Regions:
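PLP-dependent class I/II
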Residues: 1-191
Length: 191
């Protein structure tokens, strides 16, 4: 039996300290059981436009063509035109976006690292800090309390599965002023 590898590469362009994110496609042969999914959502800030692509073995082309034709039909015209512009002219936008996320990451990492109850790894990609908070056994309750008391929205780690319990996720895709303000509000809660 063949085991299929489904690779989510939606955040692959949002990497900070390497030239590019590793991909199974770099080592797979064309007919290997690997399907990589990608999207315009993250790299080109087209979230909600529902446009992406996949890379799959050529022998599966007809299968995906039928799925698309009968289940999806096709994306609206303006979204297709936007995707063409993103591919043709969007590299500067991606670079600037990644640089902004890098600044946000650095600010958030520096501030969270100084909070006594917080333990986190240095984020290498995307725009999230996923951190453990000492003494927490209900991340949803903590996220709700922090939202109620500080106005800062965090995702509870439990939303990502049982092993995420005790963690929180913070998005640093925001301006430095917004992030600094959020860190100021979080500090009393996480110290």
């Amino acid at each position: 039996k063949r085991i299929w590898l489904l690779a989510d590469e939606v955040y692959a362009r949002l990497i900070f300290d390497r030239p590019h994110a590793p991909s199974f496609l770099e080592i797979a042969s064309p007919e290997d059981p690997v399907i990589a999914f990608n999207s315009f959502s993250k790299s080109w800030s087209m979230t909600g436009w529902r446009l992406g692509w996949l890379t799959a073995p050529p022998s599966m082309g007809e299968i995906f063509e039928k799925l698309n034709e009968y289940n999806i039909s096709g994306p609206t015209t303006f979204v297709q035109h936007a995707a063409i512009v993103a591919i043709r002219d969007g590299e500067d936008f991606v670079r600037e976006t990644v640089e902004g996320y890098r600044r946000g990451r650095d600010l958030v990492y520096q501030r969270l690292s100084g909070m006594k109850r917080v333990h986190l790894a240095f984020p290498e990609a995307a725009f999230y800090a996923f951190f453990r908070v000492d003494g927490v056994d209900d991340s949803l309750a903590l996220a709700r309390r922090i939202l109620d008391q500080t106005g800062v929205g965090l995702a509870p780690g439990a939303a990502f599965g049982q092993s995420g319990e005790g963690y929180l996720r913070l998005c640093f895709a925001a301006t430095p002023d917004t992030l600094s303000d959020a860190m100021d509000r979080l500090e009393p809660e996480l110290n």
